[in-house]
Amino acid sequence: MIVVTGAAGFIGSNLVKQLNAMGRNDIIAVDDLTDGTQMFNLADCEIADYLDKDDFIKQIKAGDFDNKLEVIFHQGACSSTTEWDGKFMMANNFEYSKTLLHYSQANNCQFIYASSASVYGGSEKFIEQRELEKPLNVYAYSKFLFDQYVRQQKLTGQVAGLRYFNVYGPREQHKGGMASVAFHFNNQINTNGVCRLFEGVDGYENGQQLRDFVFVEDVVKVNLWLWQNPSVSGIYNCGTGQAQSFNDVANAVIAYHGKGHIEYIPFPDKLKGAYQSYTQADLTQLRAAGYQGEFKTVEQAVPEYLDWLKTQHFIGQ
């Protein structure tokens, strides 16, 4: 039996869909469906059962799943970088993850979890080393703290964390303001033909802030590779290894539609000092672990994503 936490979320639902494509339907989907619109992410997927995240963790603690799970893909978390309720974030992200880690180690269950590139904060290098980890918000701190906790454990089975960079693609629509710029730029072009980007900051020209934008399909492939290689444990960056600008994303959306232009807006004061103007995954450790898959560029993946978006109709749109 396979567990995917955050199964109705962005990366989790893409994982479930790909597991289905591999012939695996024996999946327990774990999530919090307070936002009922997230059910659309699972509506075309095959699962064996659904459990609320609180019920699942109670059953884990009660021993209901002892020696019954093959792998846990732990994608569930509060992923808002603007959430500052530290007590909530620690309980939801850090403590929950610790419980699943200890269960996995005690029950010979592979544990593959979502970390985040946000742990690097304002660092200019993105290598899986403690001295480069400088979280700028409580979400990033919760992810950083769990990575640190994992590093201190004497592991008996596979534990692999993936530091996701800027993931974009199908099934992210429920994230609202936290959805990718590709999603928002597409909506903006459809609404009034204008992509709105931040003006320059931190020495970058308008729209030239750089991020490692990685397609969700490629992120799923790394997760599945780890599952298929249970001897691989560690914390790994998960991005393309090549930063691209926000202008690149906007231009890919404009090129797809054959219309539109870019408009630059003032950089918000509230984000100053808490914003990553540059991220680029160093993939040295992931490659050394044996992963050989390629990652799509913005120019390759954005048209695929927009093709998918054209086929969708979301509640409220």
From Swiss-Prot:
Pfam families: Epimerase (PF01370)
Alphabetized UniProt keyword annotations: Carbohydrate metabolism, Isomerase, NADP
Positions bound to NADP(+): 10-11, 31-32, 38, 53, 75-79, 92, 143, 167, 175
Active site residues per record: Y139, K175
GO molecular function: ADP-glyceromanno-heptose 6-epimerase activity; NADP binding
CDD domains on file: ADP_GME_SDR_e (cd05248)
Pathway(s) this gene product operates in, as recorded in its UniProt entry: Nucleotide-sugar biosynthesis; ADP-L-glycero-beta-D-manno-heptose biosynthesis; ADP-L-glycero-beta-D-manno-heptose from D-glycero-beta-D-manno-heptose 7-phosphate: step 4/4
InterPro entries reported in the protein's UniProt record: Epimerase_deHydtase, Heptose_epim, NAD(P)-bd_dom_sf
EC number in record: 5.1.3.20
Cofactor binding comment, as recorded: Binds 1 NADP(+) per subunit.
Catalytic activity from the UniProt record: ADP-D-glycero-beta-D-manno-heptose = ADP-L-glycero-beta-D-manno-heptose
Gene3D superfamilies: NAD(P)-binding Rossmann-like Domain, UDP-galactose 4-epimerase, domain 1
Named cofactor requirement(s): NADP(+)
BP GO terms, sorted: ADP-L-glycero-beta-D-manno-heptose biosynthetic process; carbohydrate metabolic process
Binding site for substrate: N166, G177, H184, F198, E199, G200, V201, R211, Y275
Domains (record comment): Contains a large N-terminal NADP-binding domain, and a smaller C-terminal substrate-binding domain.
Role played: Catalyzes the interconversion between ADP-D-glycero-beta-D-manno-heptose and ADP-L-glycero-beta-D-manno-heptose via an epimerization at carbon 6 of the heptose.
Complex and partners: Homopentamer.
Family assignment from sequence similarity: Belongs to the NAD(P)-dependent epimerase/dehydratase family. HldD subfamily.
Protein name (Swiss-Prot/TrEMBL): ADP-L-glycero-D-manno-heptose-6-epimerase
